[in-house]
Curated annotation (Swiss-Prot):
Tetramer of two alpha and two beta chains. It comes from Shewanella baltica (strain OS155 / ATCC BAA-1091). Keywords: Amino-acid biosynthesis, Aromatic amino acid biosynthesis, Lyase, Pyridoxal phosphate, Tryptophan biosynthesis. The beta subunit is responsible for the synthesis of L-tryptophan from indole and L-serine. Pfam families: PALP. Pathway: Amino-acid biosynthesis; L-tryptophan biosynthesis; L-tryptophan from chorismate: step 5/5. GO terms for molecular function: tryptophan synthase activity. Signal peptide: none annotated. This is Tryptophan synthase beta chain. SUPFAM superfamilies: Tryptophan synthase beta subunit-like PLP-dependent enzymes. It catalyses: (1S,2R)-1-C-(indol-3-yl)glycerol 3-phosphate + L-serine = D-glyceraldehyde 3-phosphate + L-tryptophan + H2O. It comes from the Bacteria. The lineage of its organism: Bacteria, Pseudomonadati, Pseudomonadota, Gammaproteobacteria, Alteromonadales. Its cofactor is pyridoxal 5'-phosphate.
Amino acid sequence: MSKLKLNPYFGEYGGMYVPQILVPALKQLETAFVEAQEDDDFKAEFTDLLKNYAGRPTALTLTRNLSPNPMVKIYLKREDLLHGGAHKTNQVLGQALLAKRMGKKEIIAETGAGQHGVATALACALLGLKCKVYMGAKDVARQSPNVFRMRLMGAEVIPVTSGSATLKDACNEAMRDWSGSYEKAHYLLGTAAGPHPFPTIVREFQRIIGEETKKQMLEREGRLPDAVIACVGGGSNAIGMFADFIDEPSVELIGVEPAGKGIDTPMHGAPLKHGKTGIFFGMKAPLMQNSEGQIEESYSISAGLDFPSVGPQHAHLNATGRARYESATDDEALEAFQQLARCEGIIPALESAHAIAYAVKMARECTKETILVVNLSGRGDKDIFTVSDILNGKEV
């Protein structure tokens, strides 16, 4: 078997901690990805799908009423306008094309909020691939609109009842399935985490977010933003925004983890700042674990951020200080969800609302002219019933 072509680590984080049976499949995937990145026909087809199917470039919207500070402009990178309703569509189209290139006939995926599942289902429908999606039973219950969308597009949705019945358990089941079917199936991982080469593949297929943002900012403002802000669960929307700005030292990179019921409670999903390094989901990364090293259940109001670990490149950016990671509570995200709807007529995903919440807080504290860009990673249609139940009939 050939040597790895890409560095599997980001500093001390990352790697390929998987059963031996999966190593050939991961090496095959890495080789196919490297070859595809050098193939002009592959890149042209991917670019065409992003433009003429998914609807790129997405808008960069200057908010009119959201900023609490006249010195601060808050822009939104509108991934909510992408076909499928979230940033997930970008990298799913890339991986699905890669799977076809490798001769795979079936796609296995996991999903939390259902957005990755929907994106996978639409890509499989488009490209004629069989689709199987693992989803925690709790998430199936709280994300019923997305479950219906997946099934409507021909996907088989498999509820996972083991463990906490959420995203981490869906990930485990999907990986287990792939262990026995990798010769015919591709595991289409939904975030910039997991074993090498997934964190790199997902970043490269998502980096269009930051590339477009940089170009649009230079056109609109004649300069780069002071900070780009994105929510962080596994971290794909954030790494997509950050990737093209990492080498721009004037631009602050800010990730926002879910503080849930409070960082000082067990009910959160913020392993970057409040976890310990461990091995999970095929990678070495910060992980929520107890004193005995067992994985603790993460918690967030938003299913897509309800994950006990985080992508290895985010761990490295945090360790080196290149990016800063903050957090927002359920209550802060709920307030931001309503605030954006009221102020701008845009209903964000609860995941994205965490980033909005931090941006508004940051804007309030700025003492000079500042430009912030928030990655509005998805739309909030999927969350309206959850939010309605929580507000319990209160006037929104």
